[in-house]
Design a protein with these regions (language model features):
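Short, conserved catalytic-motif segment at the N-terminal edge
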Residues: 1-50, 70-71
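Short, surface-exposed charged micro-motifs
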Residues: 16, 278-280, 299-301
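Short, well-ordered beta-strand elements
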Residues: 27-30, 300-317
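Alpha-helical scaffold elements that line and support the substrate/ligand-binding pocket
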Residues: 20-23, 49-72, 76, 80, ...
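Short, surface-exposed loop or secondary-structure junction motifs
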Residues: 88-292
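Short, gly/Ser/Thr-rich active-site loops of penicillin-recognizing serine hydrolases
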Residues: 318-335
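Active-site-adjacent loops and short helices of periplasmic peptidoglycan-processing enzymes
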Residues: 38, 70, 75-76, 93-95
Length: 335
């Protein structure tokens, strides 16, 4: 607890943290006063937006489909997407220098422009009262406003666009809404009954979430459609720990799919030391930390050398959580 309290970023209204390891399975949380009408004081079961931590779950869903033989990672993505989606972006080589594969959607090597950097997205986030809603197709149209960053497979740049396409691919292959595919392929097998896609009909009744701050502005009321398969899930620290236990314990994917997911390459600039498929890795003095963080404050990491899991969130968006994660891992190593 002392380590976590000493590493929380100044200005954070609350931090929710869960730590599990073989010798110390524990959940810890702390709360500060908050005045947003929809906010709640955190406890270990409080839900929060996990933002890009969603990418781990989207990638796992796609990999589960590869295990079922419905697609292969090196298939052209366009082969498993509706024509109206393919026509929106340079996926099949007709409008660009190369063909984007499913693998490249998940490892940020597609070269596709990132819709999440579009001014319209951030206007919607900062002025949530406007209630602008985005369909996945709207998000792709925003991405199409910019040129590709590089030919597919020749570079690496973080882009949520690949994961929105992955979500559409999942829907096309399963003939089901994304939230149902998540539930069938990942959430139910992992025992995650407190996780849902916020923009879907899967939202539990009477569930409230932690408030989120962005540059001093309360953005709790922003519309949840701004990211979808790249960052639209809501979860709890306990559910994220269940996901990591199921994923790393071999209950969600075959060994072959797990090896593909953890085939590490240098990470996108400014994000991770290494990146696989929807999965990042930090190299630390206490050993590697494998997982993902999200822009609104969420984090979910596994320390394989310690068999420890660290999950949770802080209320402030776009803050660096790596020092907190490294401090916790170092404390567990020395315990």
């Amino acid at each position: 607890t002392a380590t976590a309290e000493g590493r929380v970023v100044p200005g954070v209204r609350h931090c929710l943290l869960r730590i599990e390891d073989p010798t110390w399975p524990a959940g810890w949380s702390t709360a500060a006063a908050t005045h947003h009408r929809n906010a709640v004081r955190p406890d270990p079961d409080t839900a929060f937006r996990i933002a890009s931590v969603t990418k781990m779950i989207t990638a796992t869903t796609v990999l589960a489909l590869t295990d079922q033989g419905r697609c292969r990672l090196d298939d052209p993505a366009a082969a498993h997407l509706p024509a109206d989606v393919v026509d929106r972006l340079p996926l099949d080589g007709r409008a660009g220098p190369g063909t984007v594969t499913i693998r490249q959607l998940l490892d940020h090597t597609s070269g596709l422009p990132d819709f999440f950097s579009h001014p319209a997205i951030w206007a919607a986030i900062r002025h949530g009262g406007g209630r602008r809603r985005f369909t996945p197709h709207d998000l792709l149209d925003l991405a199409a406003d910019a040129a590709p960053s590089f030919p597919p497979g020749t570079g690496r740049a973080y882009t949520d666009t690949g994961f929105v396409l992955a979500g559409l691919l999942v829907e096309h292959l399963t003939r089901a809404p994304l939230h149902e595919a998540y539930r069938t392929l990942v959430l139910d097998p992992a025992g995650m009954d407190a996780t849902w896609l916020e923009s879907s009909a899967d939202v539990p009744r009477r569930r409230r979430m932690l408030a989120h701050d962005l540059d001093g502005r309360d953005i709790t009321d922003m519309d949840p459609t701004v990211d979808w398969a790249g960052g639209g899930l809501v979860s709890t620290a306990a559910d994220l720990a269940r996901f990591l236990r199921a994923l790393t314990g071999g209950r969600l994917l075959s060994r072959e799919a797990w090896r593909a997911m953890t085939r590490w390459r240098p990470g996108p600039a400014g994000y991770y030391d290494d990146y696989g498929l929807g999965l990042g890795r930090y190299r630390t003095a206490a050993g590697p930390l494998v997982g993902h963080h999200g822009v609104w404050g969420a984090f979910a990491f596994w320390a394989p050398g310690l068999d420890a899991i660290i999950t949770g969130t802080v209320s402030r968006a776009r803050v660096d959580r790596r020092p907190l994660l490294e401090a916790i891992a170092a404390t567990l190593l020395s315990a």
